[in-house]
Amino acid sequence: KIIWRCNDKYKHEPHCQTPHVTEEEIRVRFVEAFNRLLGMKEQVIADCRIARETLRDCSSLEREIADLRKEQQRVAELARIAILEHVSVAEDGVNTLQEEYLAKHDSLAQQIIRLEAECRRRVEKCDLIAKFIRTLAKQETVIDVFDEKLFMAVVKHITIGRDGSTGFHMINGTML
């Protein structure tokens, strides 16, 4: 008999008070939750398609990245000029200016990395939702027994309340 408990049960004092649940209880509750999801199938799929369109459109992020790259090039050129001037005129103020330009350049690079990561995250989420849509769309009838492949394809994670209630967080953001 497999029993599941809170991932953080013993992490803090007092210990987590959520009850243990058996794998069989989770399986039965998933079948019920998935069948409720099927009752909303058309609306859920329509909502998922809208979400995918929104996620897929990274044009504003791409414009922001392009603007940051231009600014980065401008700052790099200013740093280069400051370095050349520093060679011909040894002044402490020029060295500080170089450092400011380099710090600004590094800051812009970090912003670009963050925005590119956000674009990738959105594309990955879009792909997951597409898989979720395909899985839900091909499910014609309610399920009577637990299907592990189906479970893995649609569930992101599960929460168990202190009262023993179960929340299935689906990949598309729906919570049942």
Residues of each region from the PLM?
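Amphipathic alpha-helical coiled-coil/heptad-repeat segments
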Residues: 1-176
